[in-house]
Amino acid sequence: MSADASRSDGPTGNGHAAVDEEPRPATYYHLARAVLYREYLIFVRYPANAIGGIVVSLFFFAALFLGGQLLAGQALTDSIEGIVVGYFLWTLSVGAYSSVSNDIGSEVQWGTLERHITTPFGFAPVALLKGIAKVVRTFLTSAVILALMLVITGTQLSLAPLTVVVVAGLSITSVLGLGFAAGGVTVLYKQIGNWLNLLQFGFVALISAPVFDLPWTRVLPLAHGSAMLQRVMVDGVRLWEFPLVDLALLVAVAVGYLIGGYLVFEYATARARRLGVLGDY
């Protein structure tokens, strides 16, 4: 009797244990933690590549600064603070843009794009969180570049962390939307890397857009945010000192372009599925 009872209890107990040990469904918290940890591992395991990116950015800035001094002399010295701030925002913008567009392009080339489609989260949320994780890393590397630029030029800027992070973060959110749109086009047409890289140089025109002379340019990506970041880092204006209209416009432009880029991405991937070219390369 006791042996039979013990035998009958064994499977039942194991059944309860199996039920208790069933894996819990992953949440967006787990996804965000995973992609952040992935970026950390990439930085730690391939530090030469990360350091190389910083060196290349500093090389271009040094060429711009020294060449400008030879050509413009004192005129460049008088406006060097604005150039430093603009270059800082440009490095952030390129990082935010390429974080989505180049990453999706790489997934297409490697043939690993389909694994994002099969996740329970969906393709677009995974790409968005991976882009945000790369933006966090870009902020850290751009901060190092900014510090070295200040040392090279001998200039001083107002660096209120909260204001700089909020204004710069909202400014490049619109570029993240452009990256989404470019990533969707990459999924659909595959080899368009040259066109995507060309758009990065257009960020220079957006950052230097004359928003005071041409008010309509404020609705373009980066333009309004660049003007606000100049006031923050050069004039020392704090976040709560800006007019509510300026802050509302900054948020509206950021959210508008992010949603627009997200919708383009969704449309392009859906069309690629219909055409049967999602995994083709």
Please describe what each predicted stretch is.
Residues 1-281:
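Hydrophobic transmembrane alpha-helices and immediately adjacent juxtamembrane helices
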